[in-house]
């Protein structure tokens, strides 16, 4: 019996990998100007232009229960076991909703196997858990081995990023422990990371340039101690800056490094101009 993986839209996995490994994606939504939009249906550039044209800070919401149930049922009806990997339970109610959906599907298909993992993060730090798990599943690995691989990636990965401005962190609301620190660091540029499922501060510096230098040095330090499993540069509407950072990593590590835009659900909390990197080691 094959293992199929379901994730959510905040993994920001490149489309070609979603198609290659047959990954199912359920979409979170954003609400702006009293209108709700599924993240997967949004054009990033247009959304951030819309966000900049209003004083309202958009909010985000978890995938609908119906979409969760439909995705799980489709996988089960195809004769698969189902592994769900979702955004940190401390950042969204998606993980909790998935358990409700699971119980409803199991009422209809009591012999099905559905497992749900808290990625404890978002963006491609979560995406790597999903992609590596999907690779294992496609190679014919059993559910327990796929889960072990996902957990291994989770434990050997990191996401470092720096916002262009603190405005969205101050107003956004869902940034974990970082929110308690913002008031005292208004003159500081924070390098953010995710630890124990929450956004927190990795280091505080004075300029974005210095922040990027520190991020590069940390990534190189980690990736020279161990073999690199994967690395991707994330950006929010600053593609040229993202490509420049990716080229820098390629030069230093001698491996291909792609770039991937972060969508609105995470972007509303850090804002346009944010840049960072997600990576894992073997």
Predicted segments with their positions:
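Mixed-charge interfacial surface used for oligomerization/domain docking
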Residues: 3-4, 11-18, 23-24, 29, ...
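N-terminal glycine-rich anion-binding loop in soluble enzyme alpha/beta folds
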Residues: 4-62
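Glycine-rich loop at the start of a catalytic domain that most often binds anionic cofactors/ligands
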Residues: 43, 76, 97-100
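Glycine-rich, highly charged phosphate/nucleotide-binding loops
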Residues: 61-71
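Glycine-rich phosphate/diphosphate-binding loops that line cofactor/substrate pockets in enzymes
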Residues: 70-82, 219-228
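Glycine/small-residue-rich loop that forms an oxyanion/phosphate-binding "nest" at active or ligand-binding sites
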Residues: 84, 105
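Short glycine-rich anion-binding loops that position phosphate/pyrophosphate groups of nucleotides
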Residues: 87-91
